[in-house]
């Protein structure tokens, strides 16, 4: 393992590969326990998570639903619940898969909040967009969509006195592949430290369909590049990112891209600067 790989893996608290099924099961139990502890320590009863249709929110949702189910069983308190929220922007191209994810999770409650009108209303009021290239406006509004989705989740959580779950994991964190104060904002991040193939492995552990587990990851935030795969944005594959984080050899160009991107996005992984 290169010293830089070791340093980054330590900073992101990357978990080692699952040695076997027993190790995977133990990690699932640990993360479910973490969610339960967070909820009980906050003295709250509700968890809220936006379900996009990707494997990250699918896996986080499965962990959350198991956590509240176990809390109901162990405490006898039926008020513990998990709310899955669909947050489409106007019409989502992969809505069928998003609904399939919600159906498989079987959350206690499901809500749908369309963020389209909110994002468009805000965009119409932003004079700073005047004269900007369409591509720049589209990119900024992509981040606005992510932030509006988190606003919606916190609104639901506020109404039900709950905590918001995030879906960030090590393979996204190392690339800074999240919107600051958007999908990067949450009360608890139960996938933290996992690489992408571990997130998929946990989804499989729950019996999730392969069509959802292996769905091509996409943030799908930009109107001018609908459904753009994450890996096209990264310039490297998730397999290469996972290998890098686990200290395995990767091609020279992938090593360079990951290291440079990690350094460039450091501000996204830190709290606001203060004097």
Curated annotation (Swiss-Prot):
<feature type="binding site">
    <location>
        <position position="172"/>
    </location>
    <ligand>
        <name>Mg(2+)</name>
    </ligand>
</feature>
<keyword id="KW-0479">Metal-binding</keyword>
<feature type="binding site">
    <location>
        <position position="167"/>
    </location>
    <ligand>
        <name>ATP</name>
    </ligand>
</feature>
<feature type="binding site">
    <location>
        <position position="196"/>
    </location>
    <ligand>
        <name>ATP</name>
    </ligand>
</feature>
<dbReference type="InterPro" id="IPR022310">
    <property type="entry name" value="NAD/GMP_synthase"/>
</dbReference>
<dbReference type="InterPro" id="IPR014729">
    <property type="entry name" value="Rossmann-like_a/b/a_fold"/>
</dbReference>
<dbReference type="InterPro" id="IPR022926">
    <property type="entry name" value="NH(3)-dep_NAD(+)_synth"/>
</dbReference>
<feature type="binding site">
    <location>
        <begin position="267"/>
        <end position="268"/>
    </location>
    <ligand>
        <name>deamido-NAD(+)</name>
    </ligand>
</feature>
<keyword id="KW-0436">Ligase</keyword>
<comment type="subunit">
    <text>Homodimer.</text>
</comment>
<feature type="binding site">
    <location>
        <position position="147"/>
    </location>
    <ligand>
        <name>deamido-NAD(+)</name>
    </ligand>
</feature>
<feature type="binding site">
    <location>
        <position position="187"/>
    </location>
    <ligand>
        <name>deamido-NAD(+)</name>
    </ligand>
</feature>
<keyword id="KW-0067">ATP-binding</keyword>
<dbReference type="GO" id="GO:0008795">
    <property type="term" value="F:NAD+ synthase activity"/>
</dbReference>
<comment type="pathway">
    <text>Cofactor biosynthesis; NAD(+) biosynthesis; NAD(+) from deamido-NAD(+) (ammonia route): step 1/1.</text>
</comment>
<dbReference type="GO" id="GO:0009435">
    <property type="term" value="P:NAD biosynthetic process"/>
</dbReference>
<feature type="binding site">
    <location>
        <position position="218"/>
    </location>
    <ligand>
        <name>ATP</name>
    </ligand>
</feature>
<keyword id="KW-0547">Nucleotide-binding</keyword>
<protein>
    <recommendedName>
        <fullName>NH(3)-dependent NAD(+) synthetase</fullName>
        <ecNumber>6.3.1.5</ecNumber>
    </recommendedName>
</protein>
<comment type="similarity">
    <text>Belongs to the NAD synthetase family.</text>
</comment>
<dbReference type="InterPro" id="IPR003694">
    <property type="entry name" value="NAD_synthase"/>
</dbReference>
<dbReference type="GO" id="GO:0005737">
    <property type="term" value="C:cytoplasm"/>
</dbReference>
<dbReference type="GO" id="GO:0004359">
    <property type="term" value="F:glutaminase activity"/>
</dbReference>
<dbReference type="Pfam" id="PF02540">
    <property type="entry name" value="NAD_synthase"/>
</dbReference>
<dbReference type="GO" id="GO:0003952">
    <property type="term" value="F:NAD+ synthase (glutamine-hydrolyzing) activity"/>
</dbReference>
<comment type="function">
    <text>Catalyzes the ATP-dependent amidation of deamido-NAD to form NAD. Uses ammonia as a nitrogen source.</text>
</comment>
<dbReference type="GO" id="GO:0046872">
    <property type="term" value="F:metal ion binding"/>
</dbReference>
<keyword id="KW-0460">Magnesium</keyword>
<feature type="binding site">
    <location>
        <position position="56"/>
    </location>
    <ligand>
        <name>Mg(2+)</name>
    </ligand>
</feature>
<keyword id="KW-0520">NAD</keyword>
<feature type="binding site">
    <location>
        <position position="180"/>
    </location>
    <ligand>
        <name>deamido-NAD(+)</name>
    </ligand>
</feature>
<dbReference type="GO" id="GO:0005524">
    <property type="term" value="F:ATP binding"/>
</dbReference>
<feature type="binding site">
    <location>
        <begin position="50"/>
        <end position="57"/>
    </location>
    <ligand>
        <name>ATP</name>
    </ligand>
</feature>
């Amino acid at each position: 393992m290169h010293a830089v790989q070791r340093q980054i893996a330590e900073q992101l608290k990357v978990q080692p590969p699952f040695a076997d099924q027993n190790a995977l099961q133990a990690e699932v139990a640990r993360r479910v326990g973490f969610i339960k502890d967070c909820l009980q320590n906050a003295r709250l009863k509700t968890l809220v998570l936006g379900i996009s249709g990707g494997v990250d929110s699918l896996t986080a949702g499965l962990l959350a639903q198991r956590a509240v189910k176990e809390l109901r069983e162990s405490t006898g308190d039926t008020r513990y619940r998990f709310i899955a929220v669909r947050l489409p922007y106007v019409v989502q191209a992969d809505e069928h898969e998003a609904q399939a994810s919600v159906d498989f999770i079987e959350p206690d409650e499901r809500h749908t909040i369309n963020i389209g009108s909110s994002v468009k209303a805000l965009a119409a009021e932003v004079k700073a967009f005047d004269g900007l290239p369409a591509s720049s406006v589209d990119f900024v509004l992509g981040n606005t969509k992510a932030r509006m989705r988190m606003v919606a989740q916190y609104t639901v959580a506020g109404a039900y006195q709950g905590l918001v779950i995030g879906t960030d994991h090590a393979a996204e964190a190392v690339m800074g592949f999240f919107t600051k104060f958007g999908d990067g904002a949450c009360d608890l991040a139960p996938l933290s430290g996992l690489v992408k193939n571990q997130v998929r492995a946990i989804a499989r552990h729950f019996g999730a369909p392969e069509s959802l587990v292996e769905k091509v990851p996409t943030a799908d935030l930009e109107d001018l590049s609908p459904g753009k795969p994450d890996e096209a944005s990264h310039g490297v594959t998730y397999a290469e990112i996972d290998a890098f984080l686990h200290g395995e050899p990767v091609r020279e160009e992938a090593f360079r891209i990951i290291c440079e991107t990690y350094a460039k996005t450091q501000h996204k992984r830190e709290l606001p600067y203060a004097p």
